[in-house]
Amino acid sequence: MDNLSNYLIVSAVLFSIGTIGVLTRKNAIVVFMCIELMLNAVNLTFVAFSRHLGNLDGQIFVFFIMTVAAAEAAVGLALFIAFFNNRESIDIDDANLMKW
């Protein structure tokens, strides 16, 4: 196997772990971390293909994805803090109680 295959296998494993975590966990912070893991798996794929093809387009795209992910993390954690202050729990099953 060449290097691209190794990177894609690692990326697929990371994405699978993230997907399983999103589907099975009930803690919102753990689900959020699993979503970030899936996002980083996609970033690894972009960088691997960018290096394999010899251009920087994928790496530039990853830079923008990481910028958006940082903003997403800040907003997501602020929402978790507000949810915890309101319900004193971060369980996903309690999130449906915040309906108007």
From Swiss-Prot:
| Cellular compartment(s) | Cell inner membrane
Q: Which reaction does it catalyse?
A: a quinone + NADH + 5 H(+)(in) = a quinol + NAD(+) + 4 H(+)(out)
Q: Name one Pfam family in it.
A: Oxidored_q2
Q: Keywords in UniProt for this one? A: Cell inner membrane, Cell membrane, Membrane, NAD, Quinone, Translocase, Transmembrane, Transmembrane helix, Transport, Ubiquinone
InterPro entries from the xrefs? NADH_UbQ_OxRdtase_chain4L/K, NUOK/Mnh_C1-like
In the bilayer, the protein is annotated as: Multi-pass membrane protein
Major location (coarse): membrane
Task: Work out whether the entry's keyword set contains Cytoplasm.
Answer: no
Q: What is its EC number?
A: 7.1.1.-
Q: Which GO terms describe its biological process?
A: ATP synthesis coupled electron transport
Provide the Gene Ontology terms for cellular component: NADH dehydrogenase complex; plasma membrane
Alphabetically, the GO molecular function entries are: NADH:ubiquinone reductase (non-electrogenic) activity; quinone binding
Q: Which residues cross the membrane?
A: 4-24, 29-49, 60-80
Tagged with keyword Flavoprotein: no
Q: In this entry, which stretches build a coiled coil?
A: none
Describe its function: NDH-1 shuttles electrons from NADH, via FMN and iron-sulfur (Fe-S) centers, to quinones in the respiratory chain. The immediate electron acceptor for the enzyme in this species is believed to be ubiquinone. Couples the redox reaction to proton translocation (for every two electrons transferred, four hydrogen ions are translocated across the cytoplasmic membrane), and thus conserves the redox energy in a proton gradient.
Q: Family assignment?
A: Belongs to the complex I subunit 4L family.
Record note on quaternary structure: NDH-1 is composed of 14 different subunits. Subunits NuoA, H, J, K, L, M, N constitute the membrane sector of the complex.
Which named protein is this?
Answer: NADH-quinone oxidoreductase subunit K
What is this protein's gene name?
A: nuoK
